Amino acid sequence: LATDYDGTLAHDGVVAKKTLTALERFKKSGRKLVLVTGRELPDLKGVFPELSLFDKVVAENGAMIYTPASEEERVIAPPPEPKFVARLKRQGVKPLSVGRSIVATWEPHQATVLEVIKK
């Protein structure tokens, strides 16, 4: 079973106890659990300590695969170019989240981000 975190498992940033219980039952039945999220792994670990319920975590919009049992992290894309991130910051793009493989912000900055990409 693959499931999203925000708005699916977690509502208003909280995973309900009954949801955790259902996930535990599912896992004990021998089935596999995969958590899929756009969040960066350190952020996810900070808000959801129950990651060990999952066999795999697909984070950073698919750019990182994490195995909780072994704590193995596999990045499937190169890190963001520091010059690119610096240009976005100089252009005043906020919020700006820089992960191991992704750079994320909100839609109002779309034109600025596209301009920086073109350069």
Range-by-range predicted roles:
Residues L1-G13:
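Asp-based phosphoryl-transfer active-site loop
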Residues K17-G30:
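Catalytic-core regions built around general acid/base machinery
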Residues K28-K32, L53-F54:
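A short helix->loop->beta-strand "cap" motif at the edges of active sites that frequently abuts
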Residues K32-V34, I102:
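A structural signal for isolated positions on well-ordered beta-strands in alpha/beta enzyme cores
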Residues T37-R39:
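Conserved phosphate-coupling serine/threonine residues in phosphotransfer and NTP-handling enzymes
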Residues L41-S52:
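Metal-dependent catalytic neighborhoods of phosphoester/phosphodiester hydrolases
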Residues G46, D55-K119:
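HAD-like small-molecule phosphatases
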